[in-house]
Amino acid sequence: MSFKTRAVAESTYYIKSGAYYLAVTPERQIITQNTVYAWEVSIEGEYNYLKDPGTTHYLTDNGGQNLLNPRSDVDGKWGGGSEDQATQLINAETEKPLSVPYGQPFQTWLFVKV
């Protein structure tokens, strides 16, 4: 039996892994924290762009290091987002899963509509 996840829509989401949320510090570092943090999600084909509303920058994989970038380029495309099943977020350019310092090596993420 195959299980099809429901892809995210263009909207604002909390991106959650277990009890923690994907967030950005005032210094623009990507972290997880135990309080909610909203991201603006836009869609291009099967990929998502994740924009931080506070900085208006996009979550990007820069050779395995996740950071914020002012442009929504290919390094900012993420596949795998779902509202009903926690999944790995895979970067379209590097094909690496989203990894956050001090997080699990293969974290899964759930998109919770705000």
Swiss-Prot record:
It comes from the Eukaryota. Keywords: Cell wall, Secreted. It is found in: Secreted, Cell wall. Its main location: secreted. Residues 1-6 form a propeptide. One of its GO terms (cellular component) is extracellular region. May play a role in the structure of the hypha-forming fruit bodies. This is 11.9 kDa wall protein.
